[in-house]
Swiss-Prot record:
Positions with biased composition (Basic residues): 38-52, 563-572, 627-644, 652-664
InterPro entries for this protein: MeTrfase_RsmB-F_NOP2_cat, MeTrfase_RsmB-F_NOP2_dom, Nop2p, RCMT, RCMT_NOP2, RsmB/NOL1/NOP2-like_CS, SAM-dependent_MTases_sf
The protein, known as: 26S rRNA (cytosine-C(5))-methyltransferase nsun-1
Function: Methyltransferase which methylates the carbon-5 position of cytosine 2982 to 5-methylcytosine (m5C2982) in 26S rRNA. May play a role in the translation of leucine and proline codons. May be required for the translation of specific mRNAs such as mRNAs involved in gonad development, collagen production and cuticle integrity. Plays a role in ensuring the correct localization of the germline-specific protein gld-1 during development. Not required for pre-rRNA processing, the production of mature 5S, 5.8S, 18S or 26S rRNAs or global translation. Plays a role in positively regulating fertility.
UniProt xrefs under NCBIfam families: nop2p
Keywords: Methyltransferase, Nucleus, Ribosome biogenesis, RNA-binding, rRNA processing, S-adenosyl-L-methionine, Transferase
Residues reported to bind S-adenosyl-L-methionine: 313-319, 337, 382
Residue span of region Disordered: 1-105, 513-664
GO cellular component: nucleolus
GO terms assigned for molecular function: RNA binding; rRNA (cytosine-C5-)-methyltransferase activity
Gene3D superfamilies in alphabetical order: Sun protein, domain 3 (3.30.70.1170), Vaccinia Virus protein VP39 (3.40.50.150)
Keyword GTP-binding tagged: no
Length: 664
């Protein structure tokens, strides 16, 4: 008994250490377990008492390791130890999932993903609340403060954050605005910050803000202008197929892939171990280094073998060689450029690429309408422009282009497009098409020029046949263009990952030139004006007749005497004058009717009145109280200017002298 008292404190720990022996006793056959000694019964009772005390003193985790159930016959079947069959059954059907070690690996991964997802959601909510708090405290600086800040070196991080804040405010202006600030204030601050961040002048930044009212899209466009486009090449179908060229270049150490689904000759170069412009394939004329945007106007032109084609601004010859490849070196192709030094580049590229149906010209584009009017089936005009679509190639465009430069380009483009259309043959069996393109995104150089052509010539816009691109503008701020301009295509670097570009395809309807305003519009205006004139004339006649009737009835009272109306007096004086001055009015007879006849009558009537005034005048003109001799009235010669030029100045002087003598 004394030994039992000593072990009373460590009974729970002893039960845990004797766990394997108890487990073996549970698994023994029934024959062995039936023989239970009294000592073992006493030991079980003591273990129960110690377990109760341990349950009161120790944590719950240690108590769960030993569970005793009373009222068992043998005293051992009520014991449930870890690893027993009863515990396995309890774990399988229990809702208690505190034991994480029993989960399958896929369940553990799923739980980890759920925790990670909850963490991300919580972080996003915290960030959202933080942004809302920052937006609530955002204060818009004045333009003067920003200008003072720009005088020194600006902190680009602060400027970038302010741009983001202003764009967010403009996106939800009603709820986030400062009541004391207008939208113009926010836009002005945004414009100043964008100019400071990206290095543009005010004019270009204003144009881009008009093109992209959405602030997020504007930032994407500005970022794309600072990043170069992928290097692309065009396979020369006159010498090699694109598939064979790609294999050869891959063997050279170049990583190339087909550029896009809409082109069959384009390849994009991701990286290269050799210079792209110095491979044997390049020197042999198997490909041309060319941007994907320059493939679009040639695809829209769609030249056919045997056509007469003009590339009005062709340097350095990429589009010209592409046209020759589509024509299969047949027909006649004129490659023109106004710059003589650039014509040398055209000749070199055409020789290298194997083009032999081309005539290289060095003329101004405006001269072709005089040299070969109606002489081409198809014309490509890639007009000189401001280059706002390829800013990544020339960063000086950001500051060098202003309103005057764009206006000069606009005027030149209008002259070139008129000359190009006049050089087209509208009666060509499969031609009469003009493709106008620029590497600019400004409306003044694109839609405005094409709309000008539609108003001046017999032509119409047709679909370009290109599967990609954004439709052109029909309404842009103060501009209102022809609805068919929606068939033109625009390309942006941040949308299509190519240089900014514009393509329009025009069909010539007639070789006859329209008037300045346009024949169709002029006829409509004439009809409208004619109907309006008739209406006004009818209203005037009705009002005059009503006035005459009132004057006839009422007359005019002067000094209490009723006199005839003014119009009646004029008619009476006119009739009296006609009767008395038959000799003076004799030359006015049988002149005829019409505007010229009326003019002659008026001139002759004035001359007769002057003659009558000379007869009645005493020859003096009173100025104040002094009489001055009045010069005799000199009459101009009745001889027209052209007749006077034929007869000479002497005959005119003689006639004037004779007329003065007759008057005296």
């Amino acid at each position: 008994m004394a030994i039992v008292k000593k072990k009373k404190v460590s009974a729970a720990s002893k039960a845990a250490t004797e766990k394997p022996e108890v487990k073996k006793a549970v698994k023994r056959p029934v024959a062995e377990t039936e023989a239970v000694t009294p000592k073992k019964k006493k030991l079980v009772k003591k273990v129960k008492k110690s377990a109760k005390k341990a349950h009161e003193e120790e944590p719950i985790e240690q108590v769960e390791k030993l569970q005793l159930i009373d009222d068992d016959e043998d005293g051992l079947e009520g014991l449930s130890f870890p690893g027993s069959d009863d515990e396995d059954l309890r774990d399988d059907y229990s809702d208690d999932d505190s034991d994480a070690g029993d989960h399958l690996p896929i369940e553990k991964k799923s739980a980890a993903l759920d925790k990670q997802k909850e963490k991300i959601i919580a972080e996003g909510e915290e960030e959202l609340q933080l942004n809302i708090a920052n937006q609530a405290t955002f204060e818009l600086p004045t333009v003067e403060e920003i200008e003072n800040e720009m005088k020194s070196v600006p902190n680009l991080e602060i400027v970038k954050q302010r741009i983001a804040d202003v764009i967010q405010v403009l996106g939800d202006f009603k709820n986030r605005r400062d009541p004391q600030k207008s939208r113009e204030n926010y836009v002005e601050v945004l414009k100043k910050d964008l100019c400071s961040q990206y290095g543009y002048n005010d004019y270009l930044m204003g144009k881009f803000m008009d093109l992209f009212p959405n602030g997020a899209e504007l930032l994407e466009f500005l970022e794309a202008n600072d990043n170069p486009r992928p290097v692309t090449i065009r396979a020369n179908s006159l010498k090699v197929k694109r598939r064979d060229l790609a294999k050869n270049l891959i063997n050279r150490g170049m990583n190339v892939d087909p550029a896009a689904d809409w082109t069959k000759v384009g390849l994009v170069v991701y990286d290269s171990q050799v210079p792209v412009g110095a491979t044997p394939e390049y020197l042999a004329g198997h490909y041309m280094i060319q941007g994907l945007n320059s493939l679009l106007p040639v695809m829209a032109l769609a030249p056919q073998p045997g056509d007469r084609v003009l590339d009005m601004c062709s340097a350095p010859g990429g589009k010209t060689s592409h046209i020759a490849a589509l024509m299969k070196n047949s027909g006649v192709l004129f490659a023109n450029d106004a710059n003589f030094t650039r014509c040398r580049a055209i000749i070199g590229n055409l020789h290298r690429l194997g083009v032999n149906n081309t005539v290289v010209c060095n003329l101004g584009g405006e001269e072709f309408s005089k040299i070969r009017p109606n002489g081409f089936d198809r014309i490509l005009l890639d007009a000189p422009c401001s280059g706002t679509g390829v800013i990544w190639k020339d960063q000086s465009v950001k500051t060098s282009k202003d309103s005057q430069d764009v206006q000069r380009r606009h005027t030149m483009q209008r002259q070139l497009i008129l000359s190009a259309l006049d050089s087209l043959d509208a009666n060509s069996p499969n031609g009469g098409y003009l493709v106008y393109s620029t590497c600019s995104v400004l409306v003044e150089e694109n839609e405005a020029v094409v709309n000008f052509l539609l108003e001046r010539r017999h032509c119409e816009l047709v679909p370009t046949g290109l599967s990609i691109g954004v439709d052109g503008y029909t309404r842009f701020r103060d501009y209102r263009f022809h609805p068919s301009l929606s068939m033109t295509k625009r390309y942006y670097p941040h949308v299509h990952n190519i240089d900014g570009f514009y393509v329009a395809k025009i069909k010539k309807l007639s070789n006859a030139k329209m008037s300045k305003q346009g024949v169709m519009e002029k006829e409509k205006e004439k009809a409208a004006q004619k109907s309006q004139n008739k209406k006004n004339k009818a209203e005037a006649e009705a009002s005059e007749s009503s006035d005459d009737e009132e004057e006839k009835k009422n007359g005019v009272e002067v000094n209490g005497q009723k006199k005839p109306a003014k119009k009646q007096q004029q008619k009476k004086q006119k009739a009296d004058g006609d009767d008395s001055d038959d000799d003076n009015n004799a030359p006015m007879k049988n002149i005829g009717s019409g505007a010229r006849a009326n003019k002659k009558r008026r001139n002759q009537k004035k001359a007769a009145e002057k003659q009558a005034a000379v007869k009645e005048d005493d020859g003096f003109n009173t100025v104040g109280n002094v009489k001055r001799a009045k010069k005799p009235t000199q009459f101009k010669s009745k001889v027209p200017k052209r007749a006077a030029a034929r007869t000479g100045a002497k005959s005119v002087k003689n006639r004037r002298k004779k007329m003065l003598a007759k008057q005296q």
